[in-house]
């Protein structure tokens, strides 16, 4: 640029313009601005000029970083085509909704340009996109003081919010959590009161990942109760399980010797393994995965009360309960890893849950074998008869 701001192109014989190597990176501002030799130039017309120092937007780098990661030590070229063809396209991209109109746009442009140049074989950089929702929380704004209050400085009376210091009624809105609005939550305080696992479970359970999540302390308390119930039922009943039964031989269960209650709890277990697996793998709906484990816990509680506590047991009951304990702990491990590892040790294991294989299910054991036949007379229900599915007319 000249002193009037007019733009001049660099002479072709001077290309490429190389950046100086003696720059000191202080962490403040634009490093090239500190190089007088690079910044100050003489224009072709003999006038003084100033060279552009904003030379590389970060999007230029981030638009192909996924390719460089595959060959980060290559000093001869950005990446080997063989590596790019082997690993791309990226299976899963996770980012905020703003990425759809910014980074993704630039990355696709770069990738398609690289394809045209013969440097990559794939036409698209990413297979699948997940845009996570925002975490929302109540903000408290003072019209008089023109500032946002921290929740700890607010008193709630009959659904209205007031400043503890001045008594002024505050304007309440549910908004994206941010420092500027003082409506964030301190993870350390949450962990101190409820523990890390309840915080994780609540965050994952409260909403699908692509939806907004409204922070709710009552939800945290619910997650805390759920984890405690799971811990208590397993720690109180693991002695009942057959310690020698294991996944190597499908726990040695003879399906023909199961009681009706045995059959029901095993069916619910295999349905839950299927539901959790599909919820995680297919659409990242961790909330429905956790909900499925909660349902299983209810059935486990009923089974414990009606079978274990009444000592109405058989050899198959003990084997099935061992399968239930093993698999429910592994199912909850991604969401509550600390409590899962504690329970894993309680039932006699010496490894960590993350070292174990993901539990499997048998499709046949997930099927319903009973149904209710409803008897209606003149449009009114008179009787409901339980019957096996497939019963001949």
Go through the PLM ranges and name each one:
Residues 92-96, 186-189, 327:
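Hydrophobic alpha-helical transmembrane segments of multi-pass small-molecule transporters/permeases
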């Amino acid at each position: 640029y000249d002193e009037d701001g007019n733009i001049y192109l660099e002479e072709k014989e001077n290309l490429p313009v190389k950046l100086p190597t003696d720059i000191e990176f202080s962490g403040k501002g634009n490093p090239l601005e500190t190089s007088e030799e690079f910044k100050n130039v003489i224009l072709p017309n003999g006038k003084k000029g100033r060279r552009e120092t904003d030379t590389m937007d970060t999007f230029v780098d981030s638009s192909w970083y996924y390719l460089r990661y595959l060959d980060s030590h290559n000093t001869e070229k950005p990446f080997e085509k063989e590596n790019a063809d082997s690993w791309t396209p990226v299976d899963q991209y996770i980012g905020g909704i703003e990425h759809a109109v910014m980074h993704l746009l630039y990355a696709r442009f770069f990738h398609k340009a690289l394809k045209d140049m013969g440097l990559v074989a794939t036409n698209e950089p990413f297979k699948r996109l997940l845009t996570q929702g925002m975490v929302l929380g109540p903000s408290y704004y003072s019209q008089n003081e023109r500032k946002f209050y921290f929740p700890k400085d607010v008193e709630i009376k009959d659904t209205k919010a007031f400043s503890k210091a001045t008594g002024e009624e505050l304007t309440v809105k549910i908004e994206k959590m941010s420092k500027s609005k003082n409506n964030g939550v301190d993870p350390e305080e949450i962990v101190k009161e409820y523990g890390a696992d309840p915080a994780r479970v609540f965050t994952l359970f409260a909403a699908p990942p692509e939806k907004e999540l409204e922070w709710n302390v009552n939800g945290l308390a619910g997650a805390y109760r759920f984890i405690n119930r799971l811990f208590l039922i397993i720690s109180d009943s693991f002695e009942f399980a057959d310690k020698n039964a294991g996944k190597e031989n499908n726990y040695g269960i003879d399906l023909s010797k199961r009681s009706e209650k045995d059959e029901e709890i095993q069916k619910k277990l295999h349905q839950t393994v299927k539901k959790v697996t599909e919820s995680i793998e297919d659409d990242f709906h961790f909330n429905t995965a956790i909900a499925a484990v909660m349902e299983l816990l209810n059935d486990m509680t009923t089974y414990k009360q009606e079978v274990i506590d009444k000592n109405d047991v058989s050899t198959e009951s003990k084997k099935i309960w061992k399968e239930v304990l093993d698999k429910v702990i592994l199912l909850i491990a991604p969401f509550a890893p600390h409590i899962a590892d504690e329970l894993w040790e309680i039932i006699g294991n010496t490894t960590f849950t993350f070292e174990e294989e993901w539990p499997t299910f048998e499709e046949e054991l997930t099927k319903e074998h009973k149904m209710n036949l409803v008897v209606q007379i003149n449009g009114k229900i008179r009787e409901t008869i339980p019957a096996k599915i497939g019963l001949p007319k």
